[in-house]
């Protein structure tokens, strides 16, 4: 192409004679018909640049010709199975694709395969980029760059369906030469990147990277994001191992940084990072210095690092309102999930946005943390000494399963700081997760009193310790007290410590880590929207719908296929199967979700209650979880649930203050004295509370009675006594067998 200023030359003459062709060396760079070529221009290894017409019947031959004839609106087709040598220089508004059988290969040797420099709306599709080798080539495979002056954006670049192999730096790299110029609407989709990143002395390498040049243009606290609304979906990254002794992280799968708004979805990264030796290690798929990036439904397998990091997924320093959800990692040397804010104050000033509003939910990590420097299933922490950092972090409904692998026994959950940073300013919620420790490592290591930690399943198969601020505790009560009342809310423990009974906790398929249909986990999770105002998504890890009117909540990334059956007769309406003792009135009222299913129970006589006789087969001990959904009316401030053994009149009852919102008292007689292992009280919508306790039925019993009643203050002890209140609204009772 020949330009006069910014305009392309359409006609070139010497005197009165039109120039037929212009060469640069032996390469044709212009001829008069270039502007009149058809919309589809074809290239083949069997074609001719001199005599070709750019048609499928008479194609051109070389990439140099392609670089010369490209005009906005043209589609350039390269014959599948053919190899073209050199570098393709993508032009704005052009589409580059293969035709025929298979994909065309661009063999770029030691150079880049495709360069999209200020290539607005250019599309590169279904091409193979082949470099001279990951330890020989020193460039990127496909590079999209905005080299405009400050503030100009390049829109709608597409890199789709390509295969990239044998490049020493990044496989696919989207970057800028000046900030805040960048790429808007970039799409990197359905590509395969293999065997790259092993010849870059500087580090910061990965299979696919969307970022500014990190040495100069990072830090969204100091300038706008370079990139906006980026889409990275359906890609596969393999064996991007990095270069040993590089001064920074090398060998990540996918990185998105210096970006506002983005989706990273349905990608696979495996066997990357093996050569990483720097303290700042790689991660399979991660974001940093980013706003509103969503990383979802991706898989990372066997991510490696010889030192730190080496994990599956990471929201790192400077992330704001970013999301990790529905991701699966397995067999990584570092944590499956990393929530971390690094120290930018040494560069030399704060360049990062405060780490805030980030979410990790419905992710699955299996047997990660297989190295001494990053021996964790999930890691949450900071080394940034900024009091406004690490705010409103939400980590919920993840499943983290660790085991001893070789010499490594990772801690299932670690929450800590580095460099003496005070973590007391951190805020956030860690709830409804499963932390399953199968090996010899710690169950958890928590070094903060600031974050809310509730309704998680912590279970160690080998009975390993729970650590708090460097001290190991053998009992849950000790750990809860030492850790600042973690897992203690509304006067009751919220922790669940029994085996979650997953389908196959030694498996490799994500579905193996779903709670079995008879798992005791069912219903012990909290309603995080009612408790903390956290909006829940519409599906779990496996795509099962999470109804907006859900009543029972289960920890972990997956719902059971089948809920535990409610064993009560007529659990929502007090008629068939219920005994109504001295009940003055039962009437329908507004339920939890705006319906009219709730009933108002009014009583006048002391001891008035509703009850249901339960019968079962003797011979084995049984554990039942019993409770209901209640809220106060009239002069009621409490609800009582209990059990009676009719033959010998042994009983257990539990009082819940449903005005103050806390467990008030419990009492027992006879065989029930040691039979109730746990209580639970949780918020529900519209002022309702879930109240429940678990109780053991001795093997000799064939019946007992579940009962519930309203209650009012006792005038003598200032507490609560049974059967003196009028007006308890209930929206259903339940009984589950959990053992």
Regions found by a protein language model. Name each.
Residues 11, 27-28, 562-739:
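Extracellular and organelle-lumenal recognition/adhesion modules and their flexible linkers in secreted
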Residues 45-79, 83, 479, 519, ...:
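Acidic Gly/Asp/Thr-rich repetitive segments characteristic of extracellular carbohydrate-active
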Residues 46-51, 58-60, 77, 84-85, ...:
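Right-handed parallel beta-helix/beta-spiral solenoid domain characteristic of secreted/periplasmic
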Residues 85-92, 138, 147, 297, ...:
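Predominantly extracellular beta-rich ligand-binding scaffolds that present long acidic/polar faces
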Residues 95-100, 112-167, 185-194, 228-238, ...:
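Parallel beta-helix/beta-solenoid
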Residues 108-115, 135-150, 166-180, 200-224, ...:
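Extracellular beta-strand/beta-solenoid scaffold signature
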